[in-house]
Amino acid sequence: RMPDGSKIPYWNTFYQKVFYDPIDAQDLLKQFGMQYASAEELADLVNKQLKENVNPADMNLGRWANMHNEICDYLDSRCKYLGQMDLNLKSPLVWDFYKNTLQKLAGYGAAIIRLDAFAYAPKAPGSHNFMNEPETWNTLERVRELAAPYGLTLLPEIHASYEEKTYEKVANYGYLTYDFFLPGLLIDAIEQKDGTTLAGWANELIEKHIVTVNMLGCHDGIPLLDLRGLLPEERIAGLIDLIVARGGFVKNLHGQKNVYYQVNATYYSALGEDDRKMLVARAIQLFMPGKPQVWYLDLFAGKNDHEAVAKAGEGGHKEINRTNLTIEQIHSALT
């Protein structure tokens, strides 16, 4: 809903959840001039259905059915959105916003700027939702031109399977590349007691002069879709089963059980909460080609936070690896 009251839908790539605030009799008195007893009864009727997640358009308002449109408009005017809004790349205002944001980040001392889910940015009706070419590269180059005066290096976050070779394209265009293969390869190597594939990947990075930022745990899950082409499907499935057995959660795409994306778990828990395995994994990461990125929770051997997931409710699976540690917990983990 825009400031002028008009409701304009936007193309949202990831998710969208709408929250409707409950109303009370005083709201209805002011808005519609109702009698208090009627307003109280209608407010109770509306709030009961909101609590049951009934969409306002589908509400049964009983003897106030003639007010249905007015009530819907009123609820819409007070709703809140949870989601990620897509920006219109054709608007000069968006590019002004990008420039100002890059300038501000540079002013804070930033050197590397992660471009989250970047390959979704230049989508268009009738085209793919992800990684349109050459639009993706043209857009990325335009952002690089904005970043250059501030001495900023760009890190495009683009998830794709190994067999698609997108990581090579990113590197060939002169950008830092996220090494999303390392987290899964390390767990596989440790659990299988076989570092052949991991060593092969390290050699490829060196031979092809691919400059990466790598990681173990992160604010999202452990990427497994990316491993296609590096590991056989049965090895990937085995990794999923192992991490889930150790308390992780699988994020399925589009409700299809076999179309996996990430397993959500702390890296420490994914390794069976084994100190030696975690230390070996971190040591290998630090000596792998690339710039190591360390997720704060891994520093303190963070375990799967199932309580946080339960509190977050539906869609809260990522909270398993986002625990806010107290000073006492930090001191305890360091001793």
Where are each of the predicted segments found?
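Active-site and adjacent substrate-binding regions of carbohydrate-active enzymes
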Residues: R1-T335
